[in-house]
């Protein structure tokens, strides 16, 4: 149209005004006809393409696609965006609404020789989408460096460099062309890949910047200032994060609080570059270190914590198989100990919501010869609102027992600590009938005994009380970890290993559960996982930030519990192969259970994530005199 107007004007250079008017009328008439010939669908999208040019435009678009595809072959990976990014920064295009001329201009640019592509920064050369930190062996789960002694200088304090920043400074480029080819934040959208780190070497990717359409880039380049693109090497940041955590713990042990404070301030920045389990674990350990460095202790809210802990405990039960495994293996040992008994009594040192006992009641109801008379004593802490939560639990269990026709009796004991219990509290009420069969007692403790280690002599008193009632069996479930070391650095390193694996199992289990139970089918695993992370985070804070009587999460290994119970007059009871097989079957039914492992260890059963045991179930009886 533009050339037609110029030719019309040129032909009337020496003519009369009437001739000029005639030419003007012809131009207007041609324009009107051209607008009528424009494709209506493309016109609605803002593009002017005549129907007669549709075939030509389609051919040019196909050629453009082929040219861009050839460019992608020569510039693999993240360089694809850089291959065509100069179209928005180096070239002045025709009006984009004129689709035919716009495509033709880009096609001519692609056919021209391209400037050299600058090498990608090291952080963007490899990619990894795993949120799991692996060791050099690639074991498949979160593995940290081996624990170091307090005297080791492996994790000596050293400065941690800031993330690499790619700027658009022309002086830093080899040429103006290289400067223009570096994408900036003006008009582009950025997205970060899944964070990943490998302590033994491997792949990682930093921030990736995706190019916007050429028209948007051209407009943004003209109107918006250049924004630096931050490229973070997540592999290096992950290694520095772990070293910063351990160096901070070493500084705390040496009471070098100035160095510890400097490291505490760097940990959140390093943790932000990570993803998945590593970021969450680092956040909780960073918070715990900050509480210890700044000597910040929350207000005394023991009663409120008891109610909130029960809520978190319920979510932890739903999100992963650890508590299910604990209840199942303990119930199996109790069921075998009650074989042939007509009157049985279970003392639960931490009844919580009573989730362990419906399964045992049902198993007893199906026992050949009929169910026994079942009495349950539930021990729990006082409630903040002074409600009788223990009786509410007993009422629900009584209703369930009635439906399956089991003779059921219940009694709740409120105790601030298990050390307050006396033997007479666990004995049957009233005098026993001489004609009745004696009552067989079982004592059950799930994640309770380690809390007694905070008070000198408390564990010995409780074990003495248990020994006095002469139980047929005592079932104990505890964390398989040593978080009761006198050295703060050793305790910190061990807990970092333990909870990293625990969080990794939550991530792995939740992903498998999401596949089998999508939200539309009522999966609802998101809330359970978040609350379970809070449940574990409170334990981390207690292990790291607290000391003395406040530090109640004093977990010990199976070997240490074996020594303590042996000194108290108990001997181990072998958990049979039947419990092992049924526990393995239970895990096979649990979503995401591929990473969980059940192992038998000296007559006890452990449940772990891959090769790391995390909890252990053991059974005991009063040793023969």
Swiss-Prot record:
- For region Leucine repeat I (LRI), the annotated ranges are 239-294
Q: Where is this region: PFYRE?
A: 441-542
**Annotated stretches, region: Required for possible homodimerization:** 241-278
Q: Has the keyword Transcription regulation been applied to this entry?
A: yes
Q: Where is this region: Disordered?
A: 1-34, 167-208
The chain positions of domain GRAS read 232-621
Instruction: Give the location of motif DELLA motif in residue numbers.
Output: 39-43
| Short sequence motif LxCxE motif: positions | 246-250
Q: Extract the ranges annotated as region (Leucine repeat II (LRII)).
A: 392-431
Q: Which keywords does this Swiss-Prot/TrEMBL entry list?
A: Transcription, Transcription regulation
Indicate, by first and last residue, each region the UniProt record lists as having compositional bias (Low complexity): 189-198
A GO cellular component term found in this entry reads:
nucleus
Locate the region VHIID.
Answer: 313-378
Kindly indicate whether the keyword Ligase belongs to this entry.
Answer: no
Task: State the source organism's domain of life.
Answer: Eukaryota
Motif VHIID: positions? 344-348
Chain residue ranges for the region called SAW: 545-621
User: What InterPro entries does the entry give?
Assistant: DELLA_N_sf, TF_DELLA_N, TF_GRAS
SMART domains reported for this sequence: DELLA
Chain span(s) of sequence motif LXXLL motif: 449-453
What is said about the domains? The DELLA motif is required for its GA-induced degradation.
**Family affiliation:** Belongs to the GRAS family. DELLA subfamily.
Please explain the role this protein plays, according to its UniProt record. Answer: Probable transcriptional regulator that acts as a repressor of the gibberellin (GA) signaling pathway. Probably acts by participating in large multiprotein complexes that repress transcription of GA-inducible genes. Upon GA application, it is degraded by the proteasome, allowing the GA signaling pathway. In contrast, its overexpression prevents the GA signaling pathway and induces a dwarf phenotype.
Please report the name of this protein according to its UniProt entry.
Answer: DELLA protein SLR1
Gene source species: Oryza sativa subsp. indica (Rice)
The record's gene field reads SLR1
